[in-house]
Amino acid sequence: MSEWWKEAVVYQIYPRSFYDANGDGFGDLQGVIQKLDYIKNLGADVIWLSPVFDSPQDDNGYDISDYKNMYEKFGTNEDMFQLIDEVHKRGMKIVMDLVVNHTSDEHAWFAESRKSKDNPYRDYYLWKDPKPDGSEPNNWGSIFSGSAWTYDEGTGQYYLHYFSKKQPDLNWENEAVRREVYDVMRFWMDRGVDGWRMDVIGSISKYTDFPDYETDHSRSYIVGRYHSNGPRLHEFIQEMNREVLSHYDCMTVGEANGSDIEEAKKYTDASRQELNMIFTFEHMDIDKEQNSPNGKWQIKPFDLIALKKTMTRWQTGLMNVGWNTLYFENHDQPRVISRWGNDRKLRKECAKAFATVLHGMKGTPFIYQGEEIGMVNSDMPLEMYDDLEIKNAYRELVVENKTMSEKEFVKAVMIKGRDHARTPMQWDAGKHAGFTAGDPWIPVNSRYQDINVKESLEDQDSIFFYYQKLIQLRKQYKIMIYGDYQLLQENDPQVFSYLREYRGEKLLVVVNLSEEKALFEAPPELIHERWKVLISNYPQERADLKSISLKPYEAVMGISI
């Protein structure tokens, strides 16, 4: 099989917020089809489509009730088949979201499973007796807060759910479950789907003795090491590869929650025949206070040195073994320039700076819809947020446990809430940013009149065209894909600089990720190199990259000549 995914750039679509073709306020598959030429113009090769399968939408489609049919608001299977064909006509590929750690509680399998203890589908899920006092089987927590166990009156047992109680976890120990999953994968791949992004795949293998976490009793329920990397994880993925993936020329990326580099090597070492890539979370947690009862909502200031060290550890750790994904944004993360940068006066420079850091690295870049026009976090009030995670966290942290004040929580949500990524795509300065002729399912970002696709395409200096050029450079220079990576100036608190080397060529990336001026001094071994500037986000007069006085958020990429 070819390794086309190494040279690809992926564009992620969150369909409910991308483009609404029928005016019901909800993005749809025909809307995606209508905007394919826009994505092609950007230069992306692969579209990753967030879940479109039938679902009660408790967790925006990550709770699937039917893996072989579309959710009606997105369209029909015929619309999906048309989308696959239209993507392929343009020389692009399409990857779907595979959500098989859990289903919806409205899936036919679970409806059967909960009927009785001897139902043939009982072992499709994880059922346990209560403790003698009637409480949960153990102290495992749900990632969406509260217990990971919900009591079912009908059969007097608890079922396990790492996410919401409407997302019961599948029992991967049961071979019949695995066969069902492989059948779903073949169904879509036989119709042209080019691969999978595998949702929380790191959690499919459970510690089936269900041990309690040790606790200091500050928290009733705990999310920790037992929630991922279970004893049969890699056995299951190797079986999936053997049974399904190895029969197709496809791309696979696993959401590997709880993985360190050693775990990542197991997933991505080609000789092990598992997955092509994984998403790591480590660099996205640099602004989270570790071991806080408030989890991701206990935020600390952006620390560039920590970001550099973390990203470098992954760049060097997987070198010659596996392959990295490169991302700052997706449907679960806020807008990077609002989170770690400047989304006002220096918005354009800042967006281009973060893009330069990412696209100059080794790995497959993922662009999230709106990132390429510099979309920013929303300023909507707390009561207008739709996300289940936010609602549950508010109840647990503010109302019940009182570990955060409402003011502290609101401030954290304004920085890190997932809905910042989920507001509608901003197409133009017209009503609802051109997303819909109806009423949008979630409010449009108030800054859409200044930040939109139409404005971006009319401005040759826009963030869109900068991304387009970064992608073009990646196609032109193999060093951007295959070059080795070396961090420079690791303890500089303002400048992210690194060197790539490939077959005698050198690529230098220098980015000021601060609002102040900064200085880059080339290390001695680069003093005599001559450079050609490939791209920069300020007008460039210089030809010499040995010593650079950098403006706020200035980014320069040069190649040796």
Swiss-Prot record:
It catalyses: Hydrolysis of (1->6)-alpha-D-glucosidic linkages in some oligosaccharides produced from starch and glycogen by alpha-amylase, and in isomaltose. The active site is at residues 199, 255. It comes from the Bacteria. Its EC number is 3.2.1.10. It is found in: Cytoplasm. The keyword Transmembrane helix does not apply. One of its GO terms (molecular function) is metal ion binding. Its main location: cytoplasm. Ca(2+) binds at residues 20, 22, 24, 26, 28. Optimum temperature is 42 degrees Celsius. One of its GO terms (biological process) is oligosaccharide catabolic process. InterPro entries: Glyco_hydro_13_cat_dom (IPR006047), Glyco_hydro_b (IPR013780), Glycoside_hydrolase_SF (IPR017853), Malt_amylase-like_C (IPR032091), O16G_dom_2 (IPR045857). The record marks 332 as: Transition state stabilizer. Keywords: Calcium, Cytoplasm, Glycosidase, Hydrolase, Metal-binding. GO terms for cellular component: cytoplasm. The keyword Cytoplasm applies. Belongs to the glycosyl hydrolase 13 family. Hydrolyzes various disaccharides such as sucrose, maltose, and isomaltose with different efficiencies. Also hydrolyzes longer maltodextrins from maltotriose up to maltohexaose, but not maltoheptaose, palatinose, isomaltotriose, or isomaltotetraose. This is Oligo-1,6-glucosidase 1. It comes from Bacillus subtilis (strain 168). The gene is malL.
